[in-house]
C-alpha cells in the first residue's frame, strides 16, 4: 500500500512540477520545431505542392478549397466582363438590337460572374452563352473549361487522398499507457501491450523501438537525442505478427540492453524516452502505415505485469475485455537485471560445487607422494 502511495505521490506531485520534454507524444505526433529556415528552403514546400496540400490541416485545406473555386470564378468573371466591355456589349454603350455580342445577356459584373460560374461548373442554364462573334471569347471559354477540370481534379483528389490516408487507420491501433518490467520465461523483460481495434488485419506487421537519451562521447561531445535500437519480440517472433488479438510485446533486458544497468530505485531518475514503432500494410487498401507512441521513465512500472484480457465465452468465441487493457498487477520482480543474472550465476556455481569461479578443487594422488 505504501508503495502505491509513494508512486502516486511522485507521479502527481513531482511529475507536475517537472514535465519532461517528449519527442513523440502518446498519440504519435512529433514534437519538433524547425527554426531559422531560409526563404529558399521554404520555397521547396511549394515545389512539392501535392505533399504540402496533403499535410495541411483540415481548416486550412478547406480554406484553400473554397478560395480556389471562388477565386477562379471571380477571376474569369472579371475577364468575361472585360471581353464584353472591350466589344462594347454592355448596356451603357447602347448597342444596336441587330448586333451580335460576344456573350449573350451579360449586362454587368454580376452577370459576368454568374456566366463564369455556369461555365466552370458546367451548369449551363442556357440564358447566357458564347457566340461565334469573338475569337477571344471562344479561347477564354476553352481555357476556363480546361482550368476548371484541373482545379476540380486537384482539389477533390487532395481531399479524397487525405481521407483515405493510412494515417487514419493507425488511429485504430492502440498501445498501453504504461510499460511494465517483470520476469517472463525466467528473464527480466520490458513489456508493452498493443491492440488492433478493427477486425481487418495488418499484413506484414513489424515492431521495433528506439531509446532516445542524451549521451556524452569519450571525446566530450554531447549528443542530444542519441538513438539506440530496442528489439521487441513476441512468442512467435517479431516478423509477420498475427495481429488478430491484443499482443504483449517484450524486450529482453540482457547484457546488451540499455536497461541492464538500471534498477527499480533509479528508474524514475533516468532521462530517456522509449519510442515504439509498428509498421504494417492495411489489408483493405494495401497502403503502408506506421503507428508510434513513446514512454518516459514515469510511465515504466517496475515489478508489474498486465492482467489477462482474452477469455473464451460459452458460445466458443474469444472475448477481449478492453476495460482491463491497461491494468497492471504487482508481481515479485528483481530490483535490477544485474542482480537477476548474478543470482543465476551463483546458483550455477553452487550446482557445480563451488562458489568462487577462480577457486577449483583438484585431486592429489597421495600414493605418489608417499613413494617419493
Curated annotation (Swiss-Prot):
Glycans are attached at residue 98. Interacts with SGK1 and SLC9A3R2/NHERF2. ATP binds at residues 204-211. Disulfide bonds: none annotated. Inward rectifier potassium channels are characterized by a greater tendency to allow potassium to flow into the cell rather than out of it. Their voltage dependence is regulated by the concentration of extracellular potassium; as external potassium is raised, the voltage range of the channel opening shifts to more positive voltages. The inward rectification is mainly due to the blockage of outward current by internal magnesium. This channel is activated by internal ATP and can be blocked by external barium. In the kidney, probably plays a major role in potassium homeostasis. Keywords: ATP-binding, Cell membrane, Glycoprotein, Ion channel, Ion transport, Membrane, Nucleotide-binding, Phosphoprotein, Potassium, Potassium transport, Transmembrane, Transmembrane helix, Transport, Voltage-gated channel. One of its GO terms (cellular component) is monoatomic ion channel complex. It comes from the Eukaryota. GO terms for biological process: circulatory system development; gene expression; kidney development; post-embryonic development; potassium ion import across plasma membrane; regulation of monoatomic ion transmembrane transport; renal sodium ion absorption; tissue homeostasis. The modification Phosphoserine is found at residue 25. This is ATP-sensitive inward rectifier potassium channel 1. SUPFAM superfamilies: E set domains, Voltage-gated potassium channels. The gene is Kcnj1. GO terms for molecular function: ATP binding; inward rectifier potassium channel activity; phosphatidylinositol-4,5-bisphosphate binding.
